[in-house]
Amino acid sequence: MKILVSNDDGVLAPGIKILANELSTLGEVKVVAPDRNRSGASNSLTLTQPLRVKQLDNGYYSVDGTPTDCVHLALTGFLEPIADIVVSGINEGANLGDDVLYSGTVAAAMEGRYLGLPAIAISMVGDNIQYYETAAIIAKQLVIKLSANKLPSQTILNVNVPDLPLSQIRGLQVTRLGTRHSAEPIIKEYDPRGRPIYWVGPPGIEADAGAGTDFFAIKTGHVSITPLHLDMTHYKLFDHLSNLLNEICIEN
């Protein structure tokens, strides 16, 4: 098996090394990841300048681009032969609910799926993460399962793992995305010259976090596994929107 590993925390982040080491027991692992932390990069591609790649002493490839750049690069000609599966992570922090809209970790997995491969995004939930090995072992088991049981097309798995020893994990739950309240306001400061600068505020607290959500699974000590679909079309709105548009008169 050939496994492509990427992330958004950067090629030197602890989570990616632990993940790659664990997955190496299954086959050949190639790591292609950003040269620095690119959290929040979402699905952005670099289109206005070339990408530069540096191979590190440990064999990992460091790219001066986004997580999506890394996977796109790896799967469209940089790596030969092509991988069988993409695993993105292990992210240092949650990707729950609305977080998936901004997450470079999730985006890297989505790019892999967009380019035809099964893909998993895996994140640790907590501060000052201690138990990356827990997520790495779970990722390995999921890769084994997916090698024999293919995901539907355009589907990835978004996996969130409590920062606990494996022995304290209560099980795996299939979940839906919860939601957060709106983000906190921006934080305004001033640089040494007195000019205003702005920091994006922290994410909002949980809004929809009841039973069945990814938030709830984490709170109860479970691993949350949410299937995400690349097709974002809102099919249920078709009839209502069609009726609404029929009321619009366009005159030549």
From Swiss-Prot:
Its EC number is 3.1.3.5. SUPFAM superfamilies: SurE-like. Keywords: Cytoplasm, Hydrolase, Metal-binding, Nucleotide-binding. It comes from the Bacteria. One of its GO terms (cellular component) is cytoplasm. PANTHER family: 5'-NUCLEOTIDASE SURE, 5'_3'-NUCLEOTIDASE SURE. Its cofactor is a divalent metal cation. This is 5'-nucleotidase SurE. HAMAP family: SurE. NCBIfam families: PRK00346.1-3 (NF001489), PRK00346.1-4 (NF001490), surE (TIGR00087). A divalent metal cation binds at residues 8-9, 39, 91. Nucleotidase that shows phosphatase activity on nucleoside 5'-monophosphates. It is an enzyme of class 3 (hydrolase). It catalyses: a ribonucleoside 5'-phosphate + H2O = a ribonucleoside + phosphate. It is found in: Cytoplasm. Its main location: cytoplasm.
